[in-house]
Amino acid sequence: MRLIPLRNTAEVGKWAARHIVNRINAFKPTAERPFILGLPTGGTPMEAYKYLIAMHKAGEVSFKHVVTFNMDEYVGLPKEHPESYYTFMHTNFFDHVDIPAENINLLNGNAADIDAECRRYEEKIKSYGKIHLFMGGVGVDGHIAFNEPASSLASRTRIKTLTQETRIANSRFFGGDANLVPKYALTVGVGTLLDAEEVMILVTGHGKAQALQAAVEGSINHMWTISCLQLHAKAIMVCDEPSTMELKVKTVKYFRELEAENVKDL
């Protein structure tokens, strides 16, 4: 596992965006051989999306031959709802870059047959072989996507019941009322994430410090689903200073020295 210790949220977003752009450009995608990118929603990746848009407008990257799969979507929320992840992605990213509409994949939380929708999504991911890079965030309780504590580490795309803690955390997008946050969501599974060639998790804020500590220094434990990334061959944690507060000093020092050349010019 790599840990990229940075100073603040802006640096986390910039580093993550540069890494994505470098991966896409090195891959040299074509229509027949697209780059497959997994994407999250929420507050954490906002800076990364801003930098990706800026780099696209500067001519540094094209998303014309990039296929995206989002991590999750609320169940029962109309896709036109201002807080649906469909709306979030189009407002904050897709509408500002040159990605073709047919290359965008989002879960349908209003499907008549939810189980069939989850199978369809999983099968479509597999039809491309694998996701080359999955960017994600982490919840205060260590969840990735909507794989809440005690999720199976072999799980696939499915419906999940959201914990009250997650609904309270997400209530800031619903006028502060947790009762307006849907109780269920569709999410890619832990196993789906582990199948990706590379997983990059963005961790910002002191509230995520315990989750980062569990992921880096703790044991693999389904109560901290983020810890599953210890099993991944290419996992990266990109974190700001407040999120490292629960890590041992020597752990942060080790990774800071190890990644010194990779965090220049931020």
From Swiss-Prot:
Question: What's the EC number here?
Answer: 3.5.99.6
UniProt keyword annotations, A-Z: Allosteric enzyme, Carbohydrate metabolism, Hydrolase
Q: Which pathway is recorded for this entry? A: Amino-sugar metabolism; N-acetylneuraminate degradation; D-fructose 6-phosphate from N-acetylneuraminate: step 5/5
GO biological process per UniProt: carbohydrate metabolic process; glucosamine catabolic process; N-acetylglucosamine catabolic process; N-acetylneuraminate catabolic process
**Which reaction is catalysed here?**
alpha-D-glucosamine 6-phosphate + H2O = beta-D-fructose 6-phosphate + NH4(+)
Pfam families, per database record: Glucosamine_iso (PF01182)
Name the protein family: Belongs to the glucosamine/galactosamine-6-phosphate isomerase family. NagB subfamily.
This chain belongs to the protein called Glucosamine-6-phosphate deaminase
| Lineage, highest ranks first | Bacteria, Pseudomonadati, Pseudomonadota, Gammaproteobacteria, Enterobacterales
